[in-house]
């Protein structure tokens, strides 16, 4: 069996991603963890934080089989395009951010890594740098030639997956088609089985409209699209309940009897999850041929370099990736 090792991308270099990597390196890890970033950036940020971390250089040809000792971090050096001023965005480094993601993602495809864990990027500055970018999820789908991926966040026993992700609200209803809903539901079900080890996943499905459309008086998407699609999938044996009004679904009566929730759009499902577990939640991309988890927060430019940050979400992202790799092996 191939040794398990994992890639870690710090994301936006001016944000807290480098800080998280360094603080994490002070704790022992069960598997080799390779930060794909600039060695100079980590050296600079460690000095700002007052953290003593030994940086151990590796290349694709010299990847380790054993975890680094606590207080050490493996680094696959990736050069910056411009010096980093902590807390200050610089569009000149947009391509650098994407290069780290490409190295990690391609490394997973090539079998160098068992999975990748990503710290937050800043979508705006990447686009300002002249590169069209809507998020990790979409970028990795393109890199891996995956037609459909699913964004899921989890904290504790609550998992919330999304039918649509980063769309303006006015475009959401048109994006919810029977084909998309069926593909997303199948991916969610399959990955709950294959990557999370849940033999018979129970999935609750939100309606799109208030009161799940109120029998068509507040919208017909539930009647025309959602219910017929769910019924077709139920006939194949999938355990699906819904469409349910979101404000009813997200109550203990329902959540106690499900393994995942499928929400129709970003701000329908994620506020509840983040209220329950912000700082202790993980973002998982389902449907990829690789394992990818991420933190549940942003770049926190104002906290970068201060050591006043919580590594909780990154630790959960790491633990989730480890567990998924163990289940999937």
Curated annotation (Swiss-Prot):
InterPro entries: PdxA, PdxA_fam
GO biological process: pyridoxal phosphate biosynthetic process; pyridoxine biosynthetic process
EC number(s) per entry: 1.1.1.262
Enzyme class: oxidoreductase
Subunit structure: Homodimer.
Pathway: Cofactor biosynthesis; pyridoxine 5'-phosphate biosynthesis; pyridoxine 5'-phosphate from D-erythrose 4-phosphate: step 4/5
Amino acids binding substrate: 136-137, 274, 283, 292
Cofactor note: Binds 1 divalent metal cation per subunit. Can use ions such as Zn(2+), Mg(2+) or Co(2+).
Subcellular location: Cytoplasm
SUPFAM superfamilies, per database record: Isocitrate/Isopropylmalate dehydrogenase-like (SSF53659)
Species assigned in the record: Pseudomonas syringae pv. tomato (strain ATCC BAA-871 / DC3000)
Protein name, UniProt field: 4-hydroxythreonine-4-phosphate dehydrogenase
Reactions that this protein is recorded to catalyse: 4-(phosphooxy)-L-threonine + NAD(+) = 3-amino-2-oxopropyl phosphate + CO2 + NADH
Binding site for a divalent metal cation: 166, 211, 266
NCBIfam families attached to this UniProt entry: pdxA
Keywords: Cobalt, Cytoplasm, Magnesium, Metal-binding, NAD, NADP, Oxidoreductase, Pyridoxine biosynthesis, Zinc
A GO CC annotation given for this chain: cytoplasm
Function: Catalyzes the NAD(P)-dependent oxidation of 4-(phosphooxy)-L-threonine (HTP) into 2-amino-3-oxo-4-(phosphooxy)butyric acid which spontaneously decarboxylates to form 3-amino-2-oxopropyl phosphate (AHAP).
Cofactor(s) of this protein: Zn(2+); Mg(2+); Co(2+)
Main location: cytoplasm
Note from the entry: The active site is located at the dimer interface.
The family this protein is said to belong to: Belongs to the PdxA family.
GO molecular function: 4-hydroxythreonine-4-phosphate dehydrogenase activity; cobalt ion binding; magnesium ion binding; NAD binding; zinc ion binding
């Amino acid at each position: 069996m191939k040794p398990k090792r994992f890639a870690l991308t710090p994301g936006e270099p001016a944000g807290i991603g480098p800080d998280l990597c360094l603080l994490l390196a002070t704790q022992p890890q069960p598997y080799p963890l390779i930060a794909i970033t600039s060695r100079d950036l980590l050296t600079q940020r460690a000095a700002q934080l007052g953290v003593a971390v030994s940086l151990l250089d590796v290349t694709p040809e010299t990847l380790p089989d054993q975890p680094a000792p606590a207080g050490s971090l493996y680094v696959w050096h990736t050069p910056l395009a411009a010096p980093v001023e902590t807390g200050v965005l610089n569009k000149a480094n947009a391509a650098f951010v994407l290069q780290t993601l490409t190295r990690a993602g391609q490394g997973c495809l090539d079998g160098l890594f068992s999975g990748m864990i990503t710290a937050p990027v800043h979508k705006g500055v990447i686009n300002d740098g002249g590169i069209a970018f809507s998020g990790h999820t979409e970028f990795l789908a393109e890199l891996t030639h995956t037609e459909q991926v699913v964004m899921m966040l989890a904290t504790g026993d609550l998992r919330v997956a999304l039918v649509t992700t980063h769309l303006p609200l006015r475009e959401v209803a048109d994006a919810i088609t029977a084909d998309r809903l069926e593909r997303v539901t199948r991916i969610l079900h399959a990955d709950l089985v294959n990557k999370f080890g849940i033999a018979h996943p129970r999935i609750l499905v939100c309606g799109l409209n208030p009161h799940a459309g109120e029998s068509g008086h507040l919208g017909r998407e539930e009647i025309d699209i959602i219910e017929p699609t769910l019924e077709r999938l139920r006939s194949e044996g999938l355990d699906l309940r819904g469409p349910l009004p979101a404000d009813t679904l997200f109550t203990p009566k329902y959540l106690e009897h499900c393994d995942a929730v499928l929400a129709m759009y970003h701000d329908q499902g994620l506020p509840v999850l983040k209220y329950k577990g912000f700082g202790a939640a993980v973002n998982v991309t389902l449907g990829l041929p690789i394992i990818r988890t991420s933190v549940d927060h942003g770049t926190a430019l104002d906290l970068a370099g201060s050591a006043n940050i919580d590594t909780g979400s990154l630790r959960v992202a790491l633990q989730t990736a480890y567990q998924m790799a163990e289940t999937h092996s």
